[in-house]
Amino acid sequence: YESPNMVNWIDKNDMPKANGNVYESPALDGVGIWVENKVKPIESGKSESELREEIIKVLEETGTEIIVSYLPVGSEKATQFWAQVCLDTNTAFVNCMPAFIASDKEWAQKFTDKNIPIIGDDIKGQVGATIVHRTLARLCDERGTKIEKTYQINVGGNTDFLNMKEQERLVSKKISKTESVQSQLTDRLDDDDIYVGPSDFIPFLGNTKLMFMRIEGRQWANIPYNMEVRLEVDDKANSAGIVIDAIRLA
């Protein structure tokens, strides 16, 4: 309930007490330049190797079975750190952000060799922007039309969108989302004819995510058509409904 968290589905007074503890871990590249003034990790001065040893000890002592990563977009080093921790402790890994672990052949093979569940990468909401875009793109393709251009623009007001103002952190995110749509098409679009990704941070939107999507193409007799969709969802509830099933599967 502390800022900058925006999840308030249950009234604070109705939330039961929890026994979970918060432990320090290396921040690595987990905090981007746009969120530095909102998120200040507590750092004890311990080295990465010291913290790693402490983390492994806690995981073993608590009998942890699954690690769920909701690290900020662009946390490549931090994601690899936790993936390796999972391998070293035989812990399942649910990667909810677009750093390539499950979809990387080398990393995936490491998990396969040790028979450790790995689920990811990234996450599609229950009725989220990308799954809607994928479904409509596939529909147009299956109905025999020729998609010529498409875009999907997402805006929101939580720290996820604030973090994504840093373009350097978006490389894997845009690849993940763009490929998700391209994979539904019989004929891939040229890079200049497809755009899928976050557009901007609008503070007053809070946890509300808005998606604007457009598909342009041609149907029978080479006649042009287009469609536009506006989607409004609670960004985190949309995500949580899917990751719960991923945890059950792991």
Language-model features: where?
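Metallocofactor- and cofactor-centric catalytic cores in central/energy metabolism, strongly enriched
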Residues: Y1-A92, M97, I101-F111, N226-A250
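Glycine-/Pro-rich loop/turn segments that contact NAD(P) or position catalytic residues
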Residues: S75-K77, F81-T89, V94-E168
